[in-house]
Design a protein with these regions (language model features):
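Catalytic strand-loop segment that frames the active site of acyl-thioester-processing enzymes
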Residues: 3-36, 163-164
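HotDog/MaoC-like acyl-thioester-processing domains
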Residues: 7-10, 14, 74-75, 86-164
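N-terminal first-folded block
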Residues: 25-62
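Hydrophobic beta-strand-centered segment that forms part of the acyl-chain substrate-binding groove
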Residues: 47-94, 107-112
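Generic structural detector for well-ordered beta-strands
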Residues: 17-23, 68, 132-136
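Residue-level marker of positions within ordered structural domains that often coincide
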Residues: 1, 48, 138
């Protein structure tokens, strides 16, 4: 999936991401497990950035057609939430989303963090979730001239109705 986000000919604009560390307050279940809804919430912020870059508006999230969890996320994990636009219509656009674990706490055999602050890189990053979602911006709210010119140019080249 890392290659998909970097070298995908279907990508409109560019891949955007945000990184954050999961805190003890993010843990919801036993063993400091973070609930999957936390990933979906972060994808909402990724989708908002994509919408601003495309249409100059924050958008409304219509829904997800797919969400798959592939690995657990725990307090202490450093996560990257990212995505890209795959298809643009007249008012809606479809995005691919990803959640990767980049770093985690280093724990001993008893589950305690080594030295109280030990951490380690994960190379390659671990895919924890992926999904597909649709967002929309009403025609009267679209202001692509305030967005990222690369997004508008790619959407137009892909034949997007909004940029015809």
């Amino acid at each position: 999936c890392i290659m998909e986000r970097e070298n995908n000919p279907k990508m409109i604009g560019s891949y955007v991401n945000l990184k954050t560390r999961m805190s003890a307050g993010d843990a919801h279940y036993a063993g400091e497990l973070v609930e999957g809804a936390h990933i979906v919430t972060a994808w909402g912020d990724v989708g908002t950035e994509l919408a601003i870059r495309l249409f100059g508006d924050e958008s409304l999230f219509v829904g997800y057609s797919e969400v798959r969890y592939t690995a657990p996320v725990f307090a202490g994990d450093w996560m990257e939430y990212g995505g890209y636009i795959e298809k643009v219509g007249n008012t809606s656009f479809t995005c691919k989303f990803f959640a990767y674990k980049w770093m985690k706490d280093s724990k001993d055999e008893n589950g305690n963090v080594i030295n109280g602050s030990g951490a380690e890189m994960i190379n390659p990053p671990e895919l924890c979730a992926y999904g597909t979602g649709t967002l929309m911006v009403a025609k009267n709210l679209q202001r692509p001239e305030f967005g990222d010119p690369k997004f508008a140019a790619d959407a137009k080249a892909a034949g997007a109705k909004a940029f015809a």
